Amino acid sequence: MDDKKNEDLEMRNFNGRSSPSQRDPFLAKPGAAAKRGNSAFDLSNVTNSPGISILAYCLASISMTVTNKYCVSGSNWNLNFFYLAIQSVVCIIAIIICKQAGLITNLAPFDTKKAKTWFPISLLLVGMIYTSTKALQFLSVPVYTIFKNLTIIVIAYGEVLWFGGSVTPSALFSFGLMVLSSVVAAWADIQHALYGGGAAQSAEAAAALSTLNAGYAWMGMNVFCTAAYVLSMRKVIKKMNFKDWDTMFYNNLLTIPVLFVCSFIFENWSSENLTKNFPLETRNNLILGMIYSGLATIFISYCSAWCIRVTSSTTYSMVGALNKLPIAVSGLVFFAAPVTFGSVSAIFIGFVSGIVYAWAKVRQNQSKGNILPTTQPVMSASSQSNRDAAKA
């Protein structure tokens, strides 16, 4: 709402600063560090630390993926629209509180004309985040993370068709690795479903295979929904003149009525179904997870902007590629995803493909501008993630 770093969450948020000189509203003002220089603990040592910013970004991304998987993994869970609506509501409330507290200073007043122009983009966003949660519901975290790479390929060739983009040989090689990692991941998943429990459990194998097929179908839809959202947003965003928090605010605000209407129409709101979705033994944890997932959209965006500010957009891109590995491993650790030779190989190939892709983008940017990427204007969190995704 990637990565693309936790792509669906980041693309749901920022567009980018209107100028290179525009500072992130959460970050310390000039001179603030000097005033604190004599204090026992200098906060600027933390806020200006590249290592801490990278660690914070990685932890925020991992926690968001793990939280989403936990919330939608219940055996009877079927309220995805409602879950996403709560995410958006929590995010909007958090933005308003931050604005009232003076932490956000560049959020423009609501503009009805801009909202009407942006509404079709919000509909595409609903399709993207809904199919994302459905895919995550049926697939393991490692497989989900690996298959998300395919979105980069679709967006890249969408760029070629509609925006005159280009695909370099090194980027094409990374695409081949992404496809290979997805094929290996699917093969490993299917093999484990068919033979992991032995022939005596053929009924369970059939059920597991059916679940995987549903997950792959939702993942395929998510790839094209994400590409449609990113490419359409790029076309519209230029005339909107949105700043950082404007995009996040409109994206979440405009999706709230759509998500609630879809929930009331397509989801079962009977007391019996609500009890199944929120069983007494896990109800409090689920509610806390839903609230945190809304706050995490802000955490990820802030940590991304922080990482770019104290490092560079190049470092941020590389961190996003490297972050694929711990996100995939988190699925093995927290959700007991099957650890097989095939699954580990797929994770490794996907990890390498991300590094090759980031390297290809660095080389492409260098050849275009004939300057080091570190001298280019610093971009905000999702501005960079959207650019990484859309300018493949």
From Swiss-Prot:
Any single Gene Ontology cellular-component annotation: endoplasmic reticulum membrane
InterPro entries the record matches: TPT_transporter
Record localization: Golgi apparatus membrane; Cytoplasmic vesicle membrane; Endoplasmic reticulum membrane
Chief localization: Golgi
Keywords tagged on the record: Cytoplasmic vesicle, Endoplasmic reticulum, Glycoprotein, Golgi apparatus, Membrane, Sugar transport, Transmembrane, Transmembrane helix, Transport
Annotated membrane topology: Multi-pass membrane protein
Subunit and interaction comment: Homooligomer.
Name listed for the protein in its UniProt record: GDP-mannose transporter
Organism: Botryotinia fuckeliana (strain B05.10)
